[in-house]
Structure formats: C-alpha cells, structure tokens
Amino acid sequence: MGQIEETLELTLDFTKLEKVGKQVADTRAAGSADCDPGVIPVAIQNVDTKEVILVAYTNEYAMKESFKKRKLILWSTSRNKLWFKGETSGETFDLLEAYVNCEQNSLLYVVRPCRGGICHTKNKAGAPRNCYYRKIDFDTLKLTFVDP
C-alpha cells in the first residue's frame, strides 16, 4: 500500500481524467486493446448502508459483463484491462441495480458485498474499508480517519 492511502495530507490528482483520456487515445491509435477503452465514471453504492463505497470507471464491455454476470466488473484505468472486483482479494459484489445520470455520462451501481469491504486498504482491525475512509477538514484541508 502506498503512502497516499495512509497520509493525512490532502493530495488530490486533478489530472486523472486528462491521463485517462490520453491513455484511451493512445490505446485507440495503437489498436492494442481487446475492447474499446473509452470509459465513464461509475459510483458504487452499498445497498444495505446506502454509502458510496467506491468511484471507478467502466467501459461498454465491462458494463455489459457486469449486467450479464450480475457481478461488479469494472475497467482498470491503471492496468488498462477488465477488473473483476474481488478476483484476487475475494471481496466480490453482487450487482443489484444500475442507474444512469441525466446526461448519460456516468452510472450508479447498487451492490451487495458478498463478504466485506471494497478497498484495498484495511483498518486497524484488518478489515477492508470503504474507499471513503478519510474526512476533509474544510478549514485546514487535513484528513481524519473515520474508519481507523
């Protein structure tokens, strides 16, 4: 796990979408992807707690695979490939519902965890967290752990 996951300093990456766009353009130009890498954001919500537990990306192929298998399947922008959530950790999620926003440029997936949390980070008890486990102080911009 990298320092960014444990720091109490706010270090947002405002260039993420620019990087993803360049990666998509490069992949299309090279013709090297198994499927179109064009992506849209997808918010992941826990059906039981109503918490947003992750924001990730999907492309058309990953979306259709999720719908077909009723499992959380995303597109990894860092690895540029299909991401079966929980494939290595065992933290899989059943896909229960999907919603599209008004501009049809992002999705909301409502999921049920099959076992535990969604994040690759763990709290002090060793349990996987949700991805939103640090709260920002508006005045100082310092972070506080809410699931230590």
Regions found by a protein language model. Give the residues of each.
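C-terminal binding/interaction regions
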Residues: 2-41, 46-148
